[in-house]
Amino acid sequence: MADSTADATETNADTLTLRRELKKVLTENLNDGGVKDRVETVKSIDEAIRILNRLKIVESKKRKRESDSSSVEVPKEFKCTLSKTIMIDPVIIFSGQTYEKRYITEWLNHDLTCPTAKQVLYRVCLTPNHLINELITRWCLANKYDRPAPKPSDIDYVTELFTDGIESLLQRISSPSSSVADQTEAAKELALQTEKFVNVRDFFIKELPDSITRLLTPLSVLGDEVDSNPELQENIVTALFNMSTFEKNKTVLAENHQVIPLLAKSMKQGSVVTRRNATLTLASLSDIDSNKIIIGNSVALKALIDLIGELDDLSATHDALCAVIDLCCDERENWKKAISLGLAPAAIKNIKARRNLFESLAALALISPHERVIQEVANLGVIYDLLSILRKTSCMVTCENAVVIVGNMYAKSRERSIKKILAEEENQHKTFTKIATQGSVVAVMKAQGILQCINY
């Protein structure tokens, strides 16, 4: 019994290779303009025919396997409930359910509930399910089932450029004489290079003179119209993000006076990918303590908080919340600025919508000791949302953050109605008694404190 899945992968690779060869031969003939002699032309035609015949054989084998496979019933456990087809790249989400990566990613861009369990997902985390993948592979081999191979991405074809090749890309991006199309193509190649090769991330910043400023030149000259060439902007911001993941680059990038303002603009103006990668870059740069001060003193902090309050893009909002939490942890000045810039109302907006709940509660809990935040929490009527979350959540961290906010509300709010609301919650649902017996250490302390106060 031949390895059906391996054969399928080989067939797909053969098809791609043959199509590239055919395109090359045809392009050479079309571009030749009749310069070649007749013998060379005939050879080229023969080569094209050979490739076409080979392609026909490969495609017919593929169709036969697909026909054979169609008669075998795939176990429902191996099918994605979203696509109704066999899983190629199975991943586990926060609820413990497994889905095809492509389809669950698309789902989570619009809805943060589990498609099967219907529960709110407190974290957007996709973990490869190696066990189910191995089981599917074995079943396919045993049943001679042709499981589709994952579609190759652009990065699968990238080979590492030498130093002069990277310099050439930068020259094409930064040169005033380059067309937008050429700049875009060069920026895309640089984004792929920096994604795949750590050496390129290191070399670009360390060895190329004024490389960051030159990379940003096409966007800097556009000013407020930074998104007028969206594909170019996306590729440049993506390259920046890739380079920011290299530890030695973080400080250099943050200290360049053009980088953070550009990222702030790109969070407001740009494609979905651009906005998300700009946010991820700021989150990456905030790993360094000195960078937290730089970012906190810039327009980027407000841009992050504005993005949190928009609710348009779940992934970007999630990343912005994570970035703000990182910036405010152990950095009191950023904490104060975030409060004055409206972090509490932005986080509450997410909590009320039950979107990015895990991160929104973490952000609000972080700043909840401040009196202004307590007043905003009271004014926006989020207490009932918090109590509902406490009753329903099975996540200990979410429970801890929610009860911390409630505890701070009770301790600092001047509203007498808070005590009455909490007492009614305890009488009807025993919410705080349950937390006091089965929550985290911090949650237990807060719940016990609330119980003492409402029973006093």
From Swiss-Prot:
Gene symbol of the encoding locus: PUB48
Gene Ontology biological process: protein ubiquitination; regulation of cellular response to heat
Matching InterPro entries: ARM-like, ARM-type_fold, RING-Ubox_PUB, Ubox_domain, Znf_RING/FYVE/PHD
Xref: CDD domains: RING-Ubox_PUB
Domain U-box: 73-146
Reaction it catalyzes: S-ubiquitinyl-[E2 ubiquitin-conjugating enzyme]-L-cysteine + [acceptor protein]-L-lysine = [E2 ubiquitin-conjugating enzyme]-L-cysteine + N(6)-ubiquitinyl-[acceptor protein]-L-lysine
Keyword presence, Translocase: no
Pathway(s) per entry: Protein modification; protein ubiquitination
Coiled-coil residues: none
PANTHER family associated with the record: U BOX DOMAIN-CONTAINING, U-BOX DOMAIN-CONTAINING PROTEIN 46-RELATED
Alphabetical list of Pfam families matching this protein: U-box
Role noted for this protein: Functions as an E3 ubiquitin ligase.
ARM repeats: 247-287, 289-329
Keywords of the record: Repeat, Transferase, Ubl conjugation pathway
E.C. number(s) listed in UniProt: 2.3.2.27
Gene3D superfamilies named among the record's database cross-references: Leucine-rich Repeat Variant, Zinc/RING finger domain, C3HC4 (zinc finger)
Protein name: U-box domain-containing protein 48
Annotated GO MF terms: ubiquitin protein ligase activity; ubiquitin-protein transferase activity
Organism: Arabidopsis thaliana
